């Protein structure tokens, strides 16, 4: 069994910047020649396990001695007996005093000059060799005249003479993986042949060996896999591959690059996850060597660093200090945190003026390495999850001791936070200047290279959560940079990412940002027509038939998309779907259907009718209405309906206060205000005659409801009046409609996917936000905005028909314009951005029909069609006809 031992200083360094670092490959280029890595036998004892970490071999030898000189003195052989008395040395002639001899290191290696006394033991010589080379005593064998020297013998007993030549070979141990050792040794040998050859021609052999080595890794036993993978490190394979990568010959560099990439990438696909995690020490070794040989910008180094980041994200890092059993420790990975933070900081500083900002790879790796670092620091240092700076000099056991272990890391982490936050503040400030320029019509790009800003801010917020007072600093900065922060949210927040950290601080965002995040929670509308949920509905039975189609469908089917068609009408497509949404929502919230009540002060606002719970079918209609509202939001259709605050807050899982009922019941609101503001003495005189009860009407009958135990006999006083008002409001607007709200929320949840997402949707919005999303714009339709967002097909803007059209529209009433818009697009209410917020621009299409025909529309495409009417009066007559409510709202009928 042979093993290739290198001559490189390899003191088990585990991080790029660890204290005991390895020399750069440039510094020991001569050491890395193939004549220093030679084949030698290695004997392994069955009872001796593989080392837990690679052994260090640092060769320090005389450069002049290239050959061993054999002694011509005594022919007496060294005794192999373990007993000194059995050695036949008594008759030998000995010269007492100092002795000089040579030890040739391994087969064909350098030679050491050893000075010793004749009575020194062989073991002491082994120890000198270890001090000089780093090769452990247990790994050495000394051969002289064909025989192995025993530790207990003296040099005199072995008949070592001046200028004698000894051969050092490695001790062979038994191993359970001889094929793996042979594979890697063959690969290392191949590499050194390539490095030594003047014109190398690399083959696929190295790649083949690496794939075979990975393929033979034990897949079911983590311990065996770890032992197996150690062979790769013990054989110095990473050093050999990096040496090949550092070769001045391009063919060698390409071969090494391909081989290392193959090994790193294939390990993740070939090995199961538990086994792949044992790969961490190998990747750390590659990172360390590549950093020294090629630098942190090298693509192969970046690949290894990213792979290590994905591992530490999964396995974490050890929280102990000095444990050899940990796969990855803090000191292994914190140098990567420092390196990446420095790189990101530099890139942020230049991104304000260049097209390139921090790279996605750097930011992703930074976040990956930070995850276990934050966990270890917080778990070990702060009992309450927050770190207070400056750190106290705690020297007691437990967390205080742990705190001292990571004092430098904690300080550095806080410095990283402050530095990156300052750089981000500068970037956001410059973004706002450019955003203002864009609003003025300038074409200046916002900030080139800003695509990673949001991810960096998210990580900074996560770091801030670990330090007392840091979050206040972070969110105050976000408040000052609200415009640029919101721009990043709208531009770069993606579906399926975690945005709770933003939604919890919605006050530092704009409506556009809050709407964007809310819409990301909703399912995405799919375009696969074969998976659409088809509905054929009679207009005269709109509500009941819609209920049957929606309430009894599987939620997954509804999330897949809708296909809508009215009976006896040929029109289909998105336009008809928009029309159906508008009319079915108007029917659901029609007070005559007794499901919802409108607010006295704002008749656009609705909340569940408390009396509707008496009918079980009504409760099912609340589930149906929850589904319909979620689908309308999902399809981005404004329906002209808004919720009252008491309804909205309950959907968000929040408490109801007195101020929240102002619109829903102004009479009760004023009464409660008076009770709370009355003189305490008057209240205590029982002038009001109130007790903790409520009189409620239900199905034309009155019912007395106690607001608390013994409510009938509990008099309202100045001390308990606040409690009375709170209980009264809770019963009127929470308890009385709890079942209806629960059914609506369940219907909404059916579409959105979970109750947590349902609450997050409403919690991330203000009531006014939902008004604008669900109801749409409340400002009168602007003809100028309409005109600016309309294209022409067949007509030119300068044609008289186009001029007549806009003049006629300009003189229409607000209601006529709404009807015309609905006829044209099936949209009754525009988005808050106006026509610019629609999915596409509108179009006036020139038809070839006769002049006596009315205009027609293709609502799916926002297209209005009419012939080139010969006069303005004729056009006005035709447009007046289609802007009658009964015509515009019945588009598509036969």
Over which residues does each language-model region extend?
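Eukaryotic mixed-charge, acidic/polar low-complexity intrinsically disordered regions
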Residues: 145-171
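Long, low-complexity, acidic Ser/Pro/Gly-rich intrinsically disordered regulatory segments
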Residues: 5-48, 53-56, 60-66, 70-71, ...
